[in-house]
Amino acid sequence: MDPFSILLTLTLIILAQNAVRIVGKSQIHQSIWNLYLRYSNDQQILKLRNLKAESYDVYKQRSNTSAQDEYAKWTKLNRKYDQLQTEIKAVSDQVSQQQQAIEKYLGLAISVTTTLPLWLFRFKYRKQPLFYFPKDTFPSYLEWILSFPSVPQGSIGIMFWILLLNKFVSNLEFIVKTFSTKVEKPVPIVKVEDLSPK
């Protein structure tokens, strides 16, 4: 693989890794779970959806029924509503277990896709220089640090490139957060003498 392809691939992987970090795995899990709930044909999810709709209808009927004037009808609706709530809780527990299993595999998939390629690149291309500096650009000790651990002196290797990219993304994130937060306008301090009549 040529150095430019390595640089580009590493940049994309590190940007994806930092995007996951910034957005947060829990937010990604929740978004994917919401999509799964919306478009899934799973029987438990469909049953839960139907039970909630039926429970809402019974609740509306019960609310529109006077407990004093139509006590028998209201009691029947109340019992049905309580029964539906019990069923909803049981089905919700099953769906919650399903959600935990999906989140477990999703978290594993995110971790593998964002960290494994970096480790493979570090191992496979650790001795390949990504680009060279002109001779005597930096002092020899600095060139040695930039080429650490195993590329020729006077070049930048994959380890230092990953370090630079991560630092760049974290600094960029800091700048964006700093300038995007709204700062309250300071309230002027009024001295007691200013309030006294003249």
Swiss-Prot record:
Protein name: Golgi to ER traffic protein 1
Ranges of the Cytoplasmic topological domain: 27-110, 173-198
Function: Required for the post-translational delivery of tail-anchored (TA) proteins to the endoplasmic reticulum. Together with GET2, acts as a membrane receptor for soluble GET3, which recognizes and selectively binds the transmembrane domain of TA proteins in the cytosol. The GET complex cooperates with the HDEL receptor ERD2 to mediate the ATP-dependent retrieval of resident ER proteins that contain a C-terminal H-D-E-L retention signal from the Golgi to the ER.
HAMAP family: Get1
Stretches assigned to the Lumenal side: 1-6, 132-155
One Pfam family matching this protein: CHD5
PANTHER family assigned: GUIDED ENTRY OF TAIL-ANCHORED PROTEINS FACTOR 1 (PTHR42650:SF1), TAIL-ANCHORED PROTEIN INSERTION RECEPTOR WRB (PTHR42650)
Entry GO terms, CC: endoplasmic reticulum membrane; GET complex; Golgi membrane
Subunit structure: Component of the Golgi to ER traffic (GET) complex, which is composed of GET1, GET2 and GET3. Within the complex, GET1 and GET2 form a heterotetramer which is stabilized by phosphatidylinositol binding and which binds to the GET3 homodimer.
Cellular localisation: Endoplasmic reticulum membrane; Golgi apparatus membrane
Assigned keywords, A-Z: Coiled coil, Endoplasmic reticulum, ER-Golgi transport, Golgi apparatus, Membrane, Transmembrane, Transmembrane helix, Transport
Gene Ontology BP terms: tail-anchored membrane protein insertion into ER membrane; vesicle-mediated transport
Organism of provenance: Komagataella phaffii (strain GS115 / ATCC 20864)
InterPro entries (UniProt xref): Get1, Get1_fungi, Helix_hairpin_bin_sf
Membrane topology note: Multi-pass membrane protein
Coiled coil: 73-106
Sequence similarity: Belongs to the WRB/GET1 family.
Gene coding for it: GET1
Membrane-traversing stretches: 7-26, 111-131, 156-172
MF (Gene Ontology): protein-membrane adaptor activity
